[in-house]
A protein has these predicted regions:
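P-loop NTPase switch module centered on the Walker A-proximal segment
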Residues: 1-68, 72-81, 178
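P-loop NTPase catalytic nucleotide-binding module
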Residues: 2-4, 13, 17-18, 81-193
Length: 193
């Protein structure tokens, strides 16, 4: 299920009763009710003058056949993973399949605010599963053991999470300036290769 700019989008069935009517369900409502989508969902939108079509597919192994059909028509895949490095192996079948199919892909770390390990540890755990070098575009900002925002290495900006609202732009914390510079340089080097 997706939202666009916080607005709900239409999905093809309501999770609770498996009805087949077209309904509008917000992602937050779906999550709060403990439901999750079990079928491929489609949506499209325009952004900065370009038209995009998205295929949302469940990640469970029981949905692999539907996922394979969706991947065969994809220009790019976004693999959503758990932030725990110990669970990185769950992404291996999908990452290997994407490499074998030649589908460009990016990894999105879900629930980063609940991460127990570091991004470097997660990338180290994932790297053997990918032909291409894995590069972090964002690094988390930690305050008192909690992740409160992130530094975007491409934009050279920091953001603070605000529950229920878009993240706020903040100054890059002084304790992260050296790491930001080193990680940004590494990211650019890897992209150049």
């Amino acid at each position: 299920a997706f939202t666009l700019g916080g607005n709900p989008i239409k999905i093809f069935s309501k999770i609770e009763n498996s009805s087949s009517t077209l309904q509008t369900v917000s992602f937050s409502t779906l999550v709060l009710n403990g439901g999750s989508s079990t079928e491929i969902n489609l949506m499209h939108f325009d952004y900065l003058g370009d038209h995009f079509a998205l295929i949302d597919m469940p990640g469970g192994t029981g949905f692999a056949a539907d996922g394979l059909a969706a991947l065969q028509s994809a220009d790019m895949a976004l693999v959503v993973i758990d932030p725990d490095p110990a669970r990185a192996g769950l992404a291996e079948p999908m990452l290997r399949r994407l490499d074998a199919m030649g589908v460009p892909h990016a990894i999105f770390v879900n629930k980063i605010d609940q991460a127990k390990g570091g991004i470097r540890n997660l990338l180290e755990a994932l790297q053997p599963m990918s032909k291409a070098p894995l590069i972090a575009r964002q690094i988390p900002i930690r305050e008192g053991g909690a992740i409160t925002g992130f530094v975007d290495l491409a934009l050279e900006r920091a953001f603070h999470y605000v529950p229920g609202k878009p993240s706020e732009v903040i100054d890059i914390p002084t304790d992260l300036t050296e790491r930001e510079a080193a990680d940004r340089f590494h990211m650019l080097e890897q992209l150049a290769d």
